[in-house]
Amino acid sequence: MEGSASPPEKPRARPAAAVLCRGPVEPLVFLANFALVLQGPLTTQYLWHRFSADLGYNGTRQRGGCSNRSADPTMQEVETLTSHWTLYMNVGGFLVGLFSSTLLGAWSDSVGRRPLLVLASLGLLLQALVSVFVVQLQLHVGYFVLGRILCALLGDFGGLLAASFASVADVSSSRSRTFRMALLEASIGVAGMLASLLGGHWLRAQGYANPFWLALALLIAMTLYAAFCFGETLKEPKSTRLFTFRHHRSIVQLYVAPAPEKSRKHLALYSLAIFVVITVHFGAQDILTLYELSTPLCWDSKLIGYGSAAQHLPYLTSLLALKLLQYCLADAWVAEIGLAFNILGMVVFAFATITPLMFTGYGLLFLSLVITPVIRAKLSKLVRETEQGALFSAVACVNSLAMLTASGIFNSLYPATLNFMKGFPFLLGAGLLLIPAVLIGMLEKADPHLEFQQFPQSP
């Protein structure tokens, strides 16, 4: 009976014929995040120094005079401009990515994961190319916004993550899914840690241009890997139209269409939980470099590199902790522990005035990144196998909305609180993290095994 149905579909599975080898998705995510993390803090520092030069602020990182410039209005103007242009880049990326990532993610449920991975890789490549031109030719910083928009148009990093997590869901069982999600996120963290260590030292030695050129080269390699080496995980990819409202409708139906195999309440509340977690994560990340550059810390590029590496270390420590804690605790309670440490780290950041205290805050985040793989796995188990792309494109949309919200709140709040408490945004982040802590605990207590109903083989 199945034999008569399969032959018509096999000729449509054309992408497999073009593959040189069936590689996993993790190298793609590793290369993408290495390039992005290499560019991120450097872009912030580049904006800082460009605005400093434009406004005639000498802004050196000399330790002796740093604390005496805390009330310098020119320095505060540099901080404000840097923060605002970071916001403009994120808003531009969100407005375009809101449409493209949801469209492309649901489209991947039909055509396969590789087309989205290739498009998203090309977008990241274009963004890096624009950044190289800005740095090399001293173009207006507004071109950073243009590069961000071009990247978002082709799916952005969120689209690449949507396809990557969907491909993991395609090939993993419900028993192993949480750990596989954490493993994918760990590859993000290792890449970020290495890029952070390299970026700070390289900037001090050779300036801004060479790190951006390396990011461009890595993204070229990533695009080639996505096109010719990634092993398609969708069983029967088939041709379908890209520009149709059916793709967006499939995402809406995840949350509004009643079905016996899923709980719309759980989908909505877990989506809210991951929205808040990502908002705090990216909001803090957006202002951390600026917080460290300015008084009283006055970090140089080397220390910023160490700090950014410490920020990515929890991807590894969280992976190991998740594997160990799963032997004695349910996933939800592991996430609760991670949230508790995340809150502690944010509170320490808020009151950090010396370098050792900042690194203490980073140390407290060692379990903070068990949260998102747990929530992603729970969401994945609530939908059918044929809805994984739509689900993770919805999560990518939530991710984009969270990043915009983070930029709007943290990048606007940070300059507004410079005069009375620079660390206030971190306290706000700690308070916001109480929301997912309550939601996850409430859902686990109310119906702890609901997510396994699609996967009876799991305990």
Swiss-Prot record:
GO biological process: folate import across plasma membrane; folate transmembrane transport; folic acid metabolic process; folic acid transport; heme metabolic process; intestinal folate absorption; intracellular iron ion homeostasis; proton transmembrane transport
Keyword Disulfide bond assigned: yes
GO terms for cellular component: apical plasma membrane; basolateral plasma membrane; brush border membrane; cell surface; cytoplasm; endosome; endosome membrane; plasma membrane
Mutagenesis or variant effect for residue 156 to S: 8-fold reduction of methotrexate uptake
Spans traversing the lipid bilayer: 26-44, 83-108, 113-135, 141-154, 178-203, 209-227, 267-289, 303-325, 332-351, 356-376, 389-414, 423-441
Keyword annotations from UniProtKB, A to Z: Acetylation, Cell membrane, Cytoplasm, Disease variant, Disulfide bond, Endosome, Folate-binding, Glycoprotein, Membrane, Phosphoprotein, Symport, Transmembrane, Transmembrane helix, Transport
Topology, Cytoplasmic side: 1-25, 109-112, 155-177, 228-266, 326-331, 377-388, 442-459
Effect of residue 392 to A/H/W/Y: Decreased methotrexate uptake at low concentration
Annotated consequence of substituting residue 113 to S: In HFM; abolishes folate uptake
Extracellular side: 45-82, 136-140, 204-208, 290-302, 352-355, 415-422
Activity-pH behavior: Optimum pH is 4.0-5.5. Activity decreases above pH 5.5 and reaches negligible levels at neutral pH and above.
Cysteine pairings via disulfide bonds: 66-298
Consequence when changing residue 318 to R: In HFM; abolishes folate uptake
Binding site for pemetrexed: 90, 185, 315
Tissue specificity note: Expressed at highest level in the upper half of the small intestine (duodenum and jejunum), expression decreases downwardly in the subsequent quarter and is undetectable in the last quarter (the lowest ileum). Also expressed in kidney, liver, placenta, spleen, retina and retinal pigment epithelium. Lower levels found in testis. Very low levels in brain, lung, stomach, heart and muscle.
Effect of residue 281 to A: Abolished proton-coupled folate transport
Reported impact of residue 189 to V: In HFM; decreased folate uptake
Localization annotation: Cell membrane; Apical cell membrane; Basolateral cell membrane; Endosome membrane
One Pfam family cited in the UniProt record for this chain: MFS_1
Quaternary assembly: Monomer.
Role, per record: Proton-coupled folate symporter that mediates folate absorption using an H(+) gradient as a driving force. Involved in the intestinal absorption of folates at the brush-border membrane of the proximal jejunum, and the transport from blood to cerebrospinal fluid across the choroid plexus. Functions at acidic pH via alternate outward- and inward-open conformation states. Protonation of residues in the outward open state primes the protein for transport.
Additional information: Constitutes an important route for the delivery of antifolate drugs, such as methotrexate and pemetrexed, in cancer chemotherapy. Ubiquitously expressed in solid tumors to which it delivers antifolates: within the acid microenvironment of cancer cells, antifolate drugs uptake mediated by SLC46A1/PCFT is increased.
Name assigned to this protein: Proton-coupled folate transporter
